[in-house]
């Protein structure tokens, strides 16, 4: 068995012991990684930006520049949209391709990702700061599984016949929408790339995708693999650049039929407005979170402590799903805090390429400063700082694992998305009380409950205003189940539901001489 074929146990995000036990199977990062792809990818060709502008990309673990990237703008966006529209035109190679062949291309792309898994994991660690161990076993495994899942769906998307009244024969077709604009974040650059393109291509659409300006490297590398896999020119186009320029151009472009965005709520609102003002393009938004994690006294305490820890600290706390509002039943509150602090103090913060590292740096100086400012607000507003709270005195953007107790619902750290390694622990007395408090938020992405009482589990899960609820687990995401928010955006990604966001249902009715049942 080669290292690129290693399959880890389920829930690897919440099982650091399983990751550490597999260190002997982990390949070495690619030393002196050559960054081959720094240009715009349009029509299966690498192109310089029309403006000639470039922008730097940095290593967040050191603060040092990695390389310069060609900066796309509105003119480049227009070129990419023209290429995508041509690839989607009637009679094109892509439109005439069998659905099974689309699935084969996605499978081939997954094969190529597996082949280059160590390179891509190295690139993710270098560019985003996440530990190489996580990038290889979690992120890249998720990419491969997503591509293979939607490869299997490609020739299984079908309509139905409908027994309508009268002498008619009626059936439905599920057709691709057209050109899809996609904007992805910096916290899971490659995984979000796969989440976006896989269902879109599975349904037969073409894509114009913008990676985050902080983390464009793995998306551009995927452009080379997409071409190698055999996707026709113009089917996938990749525009590195900045949100206010390229993102705004995609959102308002009348040649784009649908837009999908993962990122902040503030930007999501702007995208929805631009989509409405332009051509009423369809919009899928996966936005922020301030997710409640409810721990009842009858839960397995040590297990709940570890799951809650992983639920907020995974990926340096840079997760939209982070369970940052931890509500603990009063009778076990003090013990839960004590054990959580002990766990946080054990966390290993260091170089992403050290296999023992659990936490790397934050993405950039702006995010680093935002997190420290919110930590200070918690101290000022009266929460008890149990551990951490400071930046680490080294190069890069490292922050100590931080735990607050005696947090109340009105504090900024309990209301605002921190997107960093900060755990806030609140107390509650009754189930009805905690349900009301947990739902009293502008966010509604995910929630979790830990209890050994099935009645409590089902009552809380049905009451939560969230798109996903986990019972006695956290971050249990997979390709087969839908993901999206209740108040944090609209639409769903992943699973069969994700296909609906990238297809239109057409009704076809034929006049027939005589209806027969």
Curated annotation (Swiss-Prot):
Gene3D superfamilies cross-referenced by the UniProt entry: Aldehyde Dehydrogenase, Chain A, domain 1, Aldehyde Dehydrogenase, Chain A, domain 2
Active site per the UniProt annotation: 286, 320
UniProt entry tagged with the keyword Lipid metabolism: yes
Site (Transition state stabilizer): 187
Its EC number(s): 1.2.1.36
Keywords, alphabetical: Cytoplasm, Lipid metabolism, NAD, Oxidoreductase
Family matches, as Pfam families: Aldedh
Pathway(s) annotated for this protein in UniProt: Cofactor metabolism; retinol metabolism
EC class (word): oxidoreductase
Known function: Catalyzes the NAD-dependent oxidation of aldehyde substrates, such as all-trans-retinal and all-trans-13,14-dihydroretinal, to their corresponding carboxylic acids, all-trans-retinoate and all-trans-13,14-dihydroretinoate, respectively. Retinoate signaling is critical for the transcriptional control of many genes, for instance it is crucial for initiation of meiosis in both male and female. Recognizes retinal as substrate, both in its free form and when bound to cellular retinol-binding protein. Lacks activity with benzaldehyde, acetaldehyde and octanal.
Family under the similarity heading: Belongs to the aldehyde dehydrogenase family.
Protein's UniProt name: Retinal dehydrogenase 2
Organism of provenance: Taeniopygia guttata (Zebra finch)
